[in-house]
């Protein structure tokens, strides 16, 4: 269903990004429930879709690649403190 006549481009970008993030959340949940081997391909698919939406946010000038690049080490440092993911 095309929403172009109902939503602005900005609204479409926000809405589709929210939907894609939700689909990634759901895929991660299924890995936790059903096992890594069974569902990890879905995580890759949905993560790629989220990355595509982030790229569009950069193209629209909402965020910059520099902002993203600066944020990554901050998050990784937090993970070192609050989780075992990077230990």
Q: Each predicted region: which residue ranges?
A:
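Flexible "arm" and connector segments at domain edges
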Residues: 1-87
């Amino acid at each position: 269903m095309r929403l172009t006549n109902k939503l602005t481009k900005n609204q479409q970008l926000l809405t589709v990004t929210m939907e894609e993030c939700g689909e990634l959340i759901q895929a991660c949940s299924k890995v936790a429930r059903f096992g890594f081997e069974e569902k990890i391909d879905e995580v890759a698919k949905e993560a790629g879709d989220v990355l595509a939406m982030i790229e569009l946010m950069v193209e629209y000038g909402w965020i910059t690649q520099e902002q993203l690049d600066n944020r990554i080490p901050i998050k990784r440092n937090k993970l070192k403190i609050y989780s075992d993911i990077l230990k």
